[in-house]
Swiss-Prot record:
Cleaved signal peptide residues: none
Location of this chain's protein in the cell: Cytoplasm
This protein's name: Redox-sensing transcriptional repressor Rex
Keywords assigned: Cytoplasm, DNA-binding, NAD, Repressor, Transcription, Transcription regulation
UniProt source species: Carboxydothermus hydrogenoformans (strain ATCC BAA-161 / DSM 6008 / Z-2901)
NCBIfam families: PRK05472.1-3, PRK05472.2-1, PRK05472.2-2, PRK05472.2-3, PRK05472.2-4, PRK05472.2-5
Any Gene Ontology CC annotation: cytoplasm
Function: Modulates transcription in response to changes in cellular NADH/NAD(+) redox state.
GO MF annotations, alphabetized: DNA binding; DNA-binding transcription factor activity
Ranges that cross the membrane: none
Length: 208
């Protein structure tokens, strides 16, 4: 897989496939076809087969896929056969909502620290997490082998936070601030701009 680039859309769909397979596994279903997966997640069966083909050969023609085996493969490909420690920087409304989201743990992502520079927030609890001063960020990242940092601060502060996260040793950043971050090539950044997603919706609504 390191020899060529996997399309990001394929990775996104693989995540959706894994959730669908988890649901089948919980129901006790042991085999599934590409057509079943396609119908369950809203793509074509050809797309399912093409996406899976990036990572090897799965299933048996005329029989389909073993649900447990394919689930295990997809989780391993996505890195979800391990657990991941994360920190959240920003204890405002968005940061609080992220701390309350139970889906992280269900997929192996664990928040080990929440940070802010607002003295009125430091020391208070968001769910089970005590808000820590931003000066403790590097210490917590290093002591807990944190590889993922989530930025939930205003755009004006996002670059400073990203720089501190990189210096502390994180390998990936999920950025909710509406700004472009400047980080080394070795650090992976995924930005979630809610306004951009809304604008994509309005474009498609108008076009229809």
């Amino acid at each position: 897989m390191k020899g060529f680039k996997i399309p990001e859309a394929t990775i996104s769909r693989l995540s959706v496939y894994s959730r669908y397979l988890e649901n089948l596994y919980r129901k006790g279903i042991t085999t599934v076809s590409s057509a079943d997966i396609a119908q369950g997640v809203g793509v074509t069966s050809a797309q399912v087969r093409k996406d899976l083909a990036y990572f090897g050969e799965f299933g048996t023609r005329g029989v389909g896929y073993n649900v447990k085996e394919l689930l295990d493969h997809t989780l391993k490909i996505l890195g979800l056969n391990n657990t991941w420690n994360m920190v959240v920087v920003g204890a405002g409304n968005l940061g609080s909502a992220l701390c309350a989201y139970r889906g992280f743990r269900e997929r192996g992502f664990y928040i080990v620290g929440v940070f802010d520079n607002d003295l009125t927030k430091i020391g208070k609890k968001i769910n089970e997490y005590e808000v820590l001063p931003i000066d403790k960020l590097e210490e917590v990242v290093r002591e807990n082998n944190v590889e993922i940092g989530i930025i939930a601060v205003p755009a004006a502060y996002a670059q400073d936070v990203a720089t501190r996260l990189v210096k502390a040793g994180v390998k990936g950043i999920l950025n909710f601030a509406p700004t472009v971050l400047n980080v080394p090539d070795k650090v992976i950044v995924r930005s979630v701009d809610l306004t951009v997603n809304l604008e994509v919706l309005t474009f498609n609504i108008r076009r229809d």
